[in-house]
Regions:
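A mature extracytoplasmic/lumenal domain signature
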Residues: 62, 76, 83-86, 91-95, ...
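Bacterial N-terminal signal peptides
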Residues: 1-12
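Conserved metal-binding segment of the jelly-roll/cupin
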Residues: 123-143
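A short, N-terminal "cap"/entry segment at the start of jelly-roll beta-barrel domains
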Residues: 11-75, 159-160
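A short hydrophobic beta-strand segment most commonly corresponding to one strand
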Residues: 145-160
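His/acidic/aromatic-lined binding-pocket segments of jelly-roll/cupin-type domains
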Residues: 71, 78-81, 122, 129-130
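Short, conserved beta-strand element in jelly-roll/cupin
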Residues: 74-89, 93, 102-114
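Acidic, glycine-rich flexible loop segments
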Residues: 109-130
Length: 160
């Protein structure tokens, strides 16, 4: 009986082994930023990984002017890490004239853009972290020059 228990314990441990991690080096994300500045690209996905049936991803964003409209991601929560630059970031409020857009190629899923109405403004600077829950309107209303930031996106598994 003891050998059978040991075998079952071993099989159980093997089935629950952790999934291999996704690694992004400093050199990797700095190379992405350098290329996107040269190519004038705003949102550049770096890597994505399946997690619990959903998707976790990292993207580099580089903006030279504030956004013309605000954005809501229906299912994706984003966490921003400001790397360089300063500006004013607005969260909350609501969208006027909202239009659906599919941002799946950026790992941001079904989203809506529209005119920002209300919300809370905050000054952001290098080192700041902002968590934007799914369904929250957000945008940069002003920039003091170019701004670069990493975005961590998580889209949970969708119920079928």
């Amino acid at each position: 009986m003891l050998p059978l228990f040991a075998l079952l314990l071993t099989l159980s441990a093997e089935q629950q082994a952790p999934v291999s991690a996704t690694f992004i080096s400093k050199e990797d994300h700095e190379a992405v930023l350098k290329k996107q500045i040269a190519d004038n690209v705003v949102d550049q996905p770096i890597k994505a990984s399946d997690v619990l049936g959903g998707k976790a991803s990292v993207a580099m964003l580089h903006r030279v002017k504030p956004e013309a409209s605000a954005l809501i991601h229906d299912y994706v929560t984003e966490t921003y890490y400001i790397m360089s630059g300063t500006g004013t970031f607005v969260t909350g409020g609501r969208l006027g004239d909202a239009k659906e857009t599919d941002l799946s190629k950026y790992n941001a899923g079904i989203s809506h853009t529209g005119t920002r109405i209300g919300g809370e403004s905050r000054r952001v600077k290098p080192g700041d972290i902002i968590i934007v829950p799914a369904g929250t309107p957000h945008s940069f209303s002003a920039l003091d020059g170019p701004i670069s930031y990493l975005v961590y996106r998580f889209e949970p598994a969708q119920k079928k």
